[in-house]
Every structure is written in C-alpha cells, then in structure tokens.
C-alpha cells in the first residue's frame, strides 16, 4: 500500500484559509500563518458583532421612538409604560417603523398610551 503524504490535504486547507483572507492587506492575504491568524481574528469579530448588532438596532429603535413620542408630548419611558398599561404588545422595531412610515397610525397608538397613563403623568410631559 502506498504511503500517504497529505500534500493534497494541506494544499486544500491552505487554499481554504487564503480564500477566506481574500481582500486583506499586505502579507495577511498571502502568507498562510499570518492569513490564518487574520481569518481567525475576523471570525471572532464577526461573532462578537453579531451580538452587538442586536444591541445597536434596539438602541436605534429606542432613539427613534423617543424622538417620535416627544413630538406628541411624552417621553420614551412614559410611552412604554402607557403601552404596557393599555395592554398594547408591539415590539420596538415595529413601533419605530410605524413612526417613520405611518405617522397617523403611530399617533393613534400614542394617544391610546397617553389615555392609559394617570392624568398627572400625561400633563407633566
């Protein structure tokens, strides 16, 4: 039986790493050892940033909602409290999209939230 020298396997692994490192700058794109490190670091960043993206979008939706409800004389926290008391269960993404694309419908939601709040809280805003 012939001896297996694993040249094909090594070549395939190297090719896979270099393909992933395509577009990198300097030796990171064509030196196996450095490219492998760069690709691994890139994957770490990708994993971390998939988590961060969720946080960033939630923060963006909250900022948009805060700006939109302030036009109606409320703050974000009072608005969310009013929604909870009114029994309206809509996520922040949907509310944010509603505020941007359907201002009339969003106004109706804000009015329902205002109505569910105690009178002095709605006046204080």
From Swiss-Prot:
Name of one Pfam family that matches: Ribosomal_L20
Magnesium recorded as keyword: no
GO (cellular component) term, any one: ribosome
Keywords on record: Ribonucleoprotein, Ribosomal protein, RNA-binding, rRNA-binding
Gene3D superfamilies in alphabetical order: 6.10.160.10, Ribosomal protein L20 (1.10.1900.20)
Molecular functions (GO terms): rRNA binding; structural constituent of ribosome
Signal sequence interval, chain numbering: none
SUPFAM superfamilies xref list: Ribosomal protein L20 (SSF74731)
Superkingdom field: Bacteria
GO term, biological process aspect, one: ribosomal large subunit assembly
Function field: Binds directly to 23S ribosomal RNA and is necessary for the in vitro assembly process of the 50S ribosomal subunit. It is not involved in the protein synthesizing functions of that subunit.
Protein name: Large ribosomal subunit protein bL20
Organism: Methylobacterium nodulans (strain LMG 21967 / CNCM I-2342 / ORS 2060)
């Amino acid at each position: 039986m012939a001896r297996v020298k694993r040249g094909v396997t090594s070549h395939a692994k190297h090719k896979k790493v270099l393909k992933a490192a395509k577009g990198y700058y300097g030796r990171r794109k064509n030196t196996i050892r450095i490219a492998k490190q760069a690709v691994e670091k890139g994957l770490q960043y990708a994993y971390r940033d998939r988590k961060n993206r969720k946080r960033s979008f939630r923060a963006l939706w909250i900022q948009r909602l805060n700006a939109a409800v302030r036009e109606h004389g409320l703050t974000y926290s009072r608005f969310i409290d009013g929604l909870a008391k009114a029994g309206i269960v809509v996520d922040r993404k949907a509310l944010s999209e509603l505020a941007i694309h359907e201002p009339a419908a969003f106004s109706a939601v804000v009015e329902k939230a205002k109505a569910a709040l105690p009178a002095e809280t709605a006046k204080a805003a």
